[in-house]
Amino acid sequence: MATTKSVLVLFFMILATTSSTCATLGEMVTVLSIDGGGIKGIIPATILEFLEGQLQEVDNNKDARLADYFDVIGGTSTGGLLTAMITTPNENNRPFAAAKDIVPFYFEHGPHIFNSSGSIFGPMYDGKYFLQVLQEKLGETRVHQALTEVAISSFDIKTNKPVIFTKSNLAKSPELDAKMYDICYSTAAAPTYFPPHYFVTHTSNGDKYEFNLVDGAVATVGDPALLSLSVATKLAQVDPKFASIKSLNYKQMLLLSLGTGTNSEFDKTYTAEEAAKWGPLRWILAIQQMTNAASSYMTDYYLSTVFQARHSQNNYLRVQENALTGTTTEMDDASEANMELLVQVGEKLLKKPVSKDSPETYEEALKRFAKLLSDRKKLRANKASY
């Protein structure tokens, strides 16, 4: 929780100098953030498939990809996996996975990743298949090769510090130019579920640099939206592409934050009487659930408040299902029946209103975002041609 607070303080310190000068659409910094949640990544994957389809329709281009429209794509845990899939280049320097390929990936590999390969004295899953499939899909690609700026979090249990993998930090910290498959496994290595991940890179002097990493949710508590915005803010200050942005304000931000769902109000909640009888192990399991839920709500609360205060509420969209029940609440239930339910959750979510105070549905809001993203991309391209 202290790490989340530090990121929040850093973010608001950077933005404290923002001007009120309204920028043109072409100068917007566009950010996509994807939560962690294991197999529940199927929910944001379903949303991304819809959004990419809308971008293809708006631009009349079946080859349009999300990485073409977002300046920063950030994720933690399963969100980090999605980030890598849509930003890692293939042999043609295009994203190796379209958004429509992500859900089939979960269906094909989820049951093997979340199998019963662990032991009673260790993590529930040994992670061997997971790492193998990541190596096969992502190859030797490193951070610097990502097709847009990325922000993938993990936590080093040896240094007791968060590790943020971004392209913009490589000049200062070349040891962060790790292989994408190492990063993806690390950000998803949730304690008790998968073993921590050890790998080595090299510093600018050629010295070995060791990583001992676990799930990025330990660093960002599941929702990387603040982290992604902090990276975007820093990027806008150093990237020549954003030279015309003198001082970033909220009218120059477009943030899409995708959740993996939270439990319904009375599902998996507890009373003080129940909790009074718990031992340490029971508390560990409950605290993880409570912390993730609290972080998701509070991060959205912070961002909604700030964007609204700056009269830029239409520039921020949080897509989240808050009424998961039954098996859909589990991050490791990769049965075909449950994965089908998660797809349905994502599809039904598109038809729901963004808030109780707004008649706009998530589907309508995403169509609006697709138009904004398309317009911004075209304006920036036109500006570059002069």
Swiss-Prot record:
SUPFAM superfamilies tied to this protein: FabD/lysophospholipase-like
Signal sequence extent: 1-23
EC code(s) of this entry: 3.1.1.-
Glycosylation sites: 115
Intervals of motif GXGXXG: 36-41
Tissue: Tuber.
GO terms assigned for molecular function: monoacylglycerol lipase activity; nutrient reservoir activity; phospholipase activity
Keyword Transmembrane: no
Domain PNPLA: residue ranges: 32-229
Domains (record comment): The nitrogen atoms of the two glycine residues in the GGXR motif define the oxyanion hole, and stabilize the oxyanion that forms during the nucleophilic attack by the catalytic serine during substrate cleavage.
Family: Belongs to the patatin family.
The protein's name in its UniProt record: Patatin-2-Kuras 3
Gene: pat2-k3
